[in-house]
Amino acid sequence: MAAAALRPPAQGTVTFEDVAVNFSQEEWSLLSEAQRCLYHDVMLENLTLISSLGCWYGAKDETPSKQTLSIQQESPLRTHWTGVCTKKVHLWGMCGPLLGDILHQGTQHNQKLNGFGAYEKKLDDDANHHQDQKQHIGEKSYRSNAKGTSFVKNCKFHMSHEPFIFHEVGKDFLSSLRLLQQEDIHTSGKSNFETKHGIPLQGGKTHYICGESTIPFSNKHSLVLHQRLLPREGPYVCSDSGKFTSKSNSFNNHQGVRTGKRPYQCGQCDESFWYKAHLTEHQRVHTGERPYECGECDKSFSHKHSLVDHQRVHTGERPYECDECGKSFSHKRSLVHHQRVHTGERPYQCGECGKSFNHKCNLIQHQRVHTGERPFECTACGKLFRSNSHLKEHQRVHTGERPYECKECRKSFRYKSHLTEHQRVHTGERPYECRECGKCFHQKGSLIQHQQIHSGERPHECGECGKCFHQKGSLIRHQQIHSGERPHECGECGKCFRQKGNLIKHQRVHTGERHHEC
């Protein structure tokens, strides 16, 4: 990457090309009517600025002597001066078709230059004028100018002793015009724009006053480009991209993005950022500052966007919708995670076993299987869990909370997955099918247990007698034979049973219920 350059100020003698932009007829045809008007205004304002700063223009490499065109300007920035042109010619006759019209308009109507000066035209329009012009500048140069090249190539400006910086409008003037038009669209709807930036005049027109030179302008576009011409620090120009700015911090940010360097580093954790604002937000992690507070529930956040996301909980707004299934979400990241269900994308892979996951948090939880880490402890019984969600689900055993209720039978469950499986009893859905015999099941666990019948697998072995079972529940019930445990007690007579099913059958003796009729 080439090193970024700081454009040096143009001091002493400069050509008008340093501040003017010329279009060919083909380029001119690409501009809209609004852009042409803007170009016209900007060139007039540039001419005004040059006059106000005490510049004079004449034919190249000649000593100034007063001829037929004089421009007198009383500037608030300079003492009285007189600028002269060294040849008795129509200036706009030497210009291209665009700049020529602008200079012609400025002189023909004795237009005041923003209220500070005036043109005085004393030109001879005799029939021999063009012939004299050819003899003075040469036939080749005249033909070139007739094709549209500007007279500015043959003119120079003698600057005052004070240094002055001309800012280029930009490599792509069309882009600059579009940018300025967009800025005007965004600000035109603000009711306080005139009170801040403009002074209303008669007829509803507004003057936009430059705060540095006090020069008034008829529109905001001209003021913006004028302020780029004022002496200031910079501009800072990136030699790679061609982008420029008058602010050193903006230039540093741009360079950081291009080089990959993050200039703003956190002193607490060594994390670095491209922008100072991002560093400020990050430091709230260490300070605990939460300046953004929800007006509904008083919950506070360290970032404004977090508050905006949270407020959708109260409003119920779900602006992010899945194109595949129509499901909507309150957060964009939730939509991105959901879309992986449709695409099958699993970007987070375990380095130990190669298993992949949709979400990073699921990978972190899975990795604790390999490390054996169980950082979440139940305060009631001391049991440890790999994830906070598993701990919260377990705590419902102690609290008796069953937040998931079936709308059909009002039966409630501790876990949402249990409710989902239960609802299949009402719907008759059996999504899990055995490939061996075609039998279907409500639950995936039931299918796995059934498949052990076909495979002959009995993974659960009794440590006392060596007997094996298909299901873990069957092993637990069997072990009660060895332990003598009978956990299911009848409330009527106190008789105890190893299995709950046996207790239910026994209770019919007391109720007189006859479940099976002939």
From Swiss-Prot:
- Recorded protein name is Zinc finger protein 776
* CDD domains on file: KRAB_A-box
**InterPro entries membership:** GLI_C2H2-zinc-finger, KRAB, KRAB_dom_sf, Znf_C2H2_sf, Znf_C2H2_type
Give me the gene this protein comes from: ZNF776
Instruction: Name the source organism.
Output: Homo sapiens
Q: Where is the KRAB domain?
A: 14-89
Q: Where is this cross-link: Glycyl lysine isopeptide (Lys-Gly) (interchain with G-Cter in SUMO2)?
A: K171, K196, K220, K247
Can you cite a GO biological process for this protein?
positive regulation of transcription by RNA polymerase II
Record has Zinc as a keyword: yes
Intracellular or extracellular location(s):
Nucleus
What is the protein's known function? May be involved in transcriptional regulation.
GO MF terms listed in the record are: DNA-binding transcription factor activity, RNA polymerase II-specific; RNA polymerase II cis-regulatory region sequence-specific DNA binding; zinc ion binding
Give the principal location in a single coarse category.
nucleus
Q: What is the lineage of its organism?
A: Eukaryota, Metazoa, Chordata, Craniata, Vertebrata
GO cellular component labels:
nucleus
Say which domain of life the source belongs to: Eukaryota
Family of the protein in this entry: Belongs to the krueppel C2H2-type zinc-finger protein family.
Q: Which UniProt keywords apply?
A: DNA-binding, Isopeptide bond, Metal-binding, Nucleus, Repeat, Transcription, Transcription regulation, Ubl conjugation, Zinc, Zinc-finger
Pfam families under this entry? KRAB (PF01352), zf-C2H2 (PF00096)
Q: Where are the zinc fingers (C2H2-type)?
A: 208-230, 236-258, 264-286, 292-314, 320-342, 348-370, 376-398, 404-426, 432-454, 460-482, 488-510
The yes or no answer to whether the keyword Zinc is present is yes
